Amino acid sequence: MTLFHLILVAAIQGLTEFLPVSSSGHLVLLPALTGQPDQGLAIDVAVHVGSLLAVILYFWSDVRIAATGSLRLARGKVDTQGAFLALCLIIATIPVMIAGLIIKLTGLDEMMRSVAVIGWTMLGFGLVLYWADRTGASTRTASGWTLKDAFLMGLAQILSLIPGTSRSGITITAARRLGYEREGAAKLAMLMSIPTIIASGAVLGADVIGEADWQMARDGALAAALAFVSALLALALMMRLLKSVSFTPYVVYRVILGLILLVYAYS
């Protein structure tokens, strides 16, 4: 794997992981459209680790509260803000973990990795995000997250297993329709990403254990560092822009890219 390809993969993963434009969709498109070889599972794991560290750092205060609360939750107590947040995150993660396992065991994940699928999901779910963002009530904040909403957002997150959907995009869409204001919707989507990335990274990591060598470790470390920096910058920029800008720019990007991909796929 060339240095340029490595930098490109890490930058794409970092910049698109938390924006509602689908990182997995872009990574699938990279080899399909450029002729570059697939980056491999080891690099996938590395860029996931970099993205994970970025979101943990950005939302460290919330992560610390949830981590502390999880200790009380483990003792069967949901009597603190942290314990309740930890419970919500668990409930939000269970649906996608079950669905992801089923898809992996049945081989559906490989069947969905096509330019046409990504084109349709980019376009379709981009329009759904626009609808939800325009019609959402914006009367609720992230601090008002409920177990019911966590479960509903978790169900929506299942759709992110289809390349091109965008995990953050579909969970933000669900949150906006549930009445959460834009910053709150994005924050909840980002917090939900932490256990999801950990779970998917663990699954990918299990497939590469024992295959690592010095070159793979070096490439992985560089990819993780680059993904961390680009993800942190993208996350900070999005959260800042959401104070005054809607999700429409991301929708426009998704629609344009989706149409281009559909023309490419069917021509």
Swiss-Prot record:
| Cell inner membrane is among the record's keywords | yes
User: What InterPro entries does the annotation carry?
Assistant: UppP (IPR003824)
Name the reaction it catalyses. di-trans,octa-cis-undecaprenyl diphosphate + H2O = di-trans,octa-cis-undecaprenyl phosphate + phosphate + H(+)
This entry's Enzyme Commission designation comes to 3.6.1.27
| Cellular component GO terms, alphabetical | plasma membrane
As for membrane topology, the entry says:
Multi-pass membrane protein
- Broad EC category: hydrolase
Q: Which residues cross the membrane?
A: 1-21, 40-60, 83-103, 111-131, 144-164, 189-209, 219-239, 245-265
**What's a Gene Ontology MF term here?**
undecaprenyl-diphosphatase activity
Where in or outside the cell it occurs: the entry states: Cell inner membrane
Q: Choose any GO biological process term that the UniProt entry carries and state it.
A: peptidoglycan biosynthetic process
Instruction: Extract the coiled-coil ranges from the record.
Output: none
Q: Which Pfam families match?
A: BacA (PF02673)
Indicate where this protein is primarily found.
Answer: membrane
What role does this protein play?
Catalyzes the dephosphorylation of undecaprenyl diphosphate (UPP). Confers resistance to bacitracin.
* Miscellaneous information on this protein: Bacitracin is thought to be involved in the inhibition of peptidoglycan synthesis by sequestering undecaprenyl diphosphate, thereby reducing the pool of lipid carrier available.
Spell out the protein name for this chain. Answer: Undecaprenyl-diphosphatase
Question: Which species?
Answer: Roseobacter denitrificans (strain ATCC 33942 / OCh 114)
Q: What is the lineage of its organism?
A: Bacteria, Pseudomonadati, Pseudomonadota, Alphaproteobacteria, Rhodobacterales
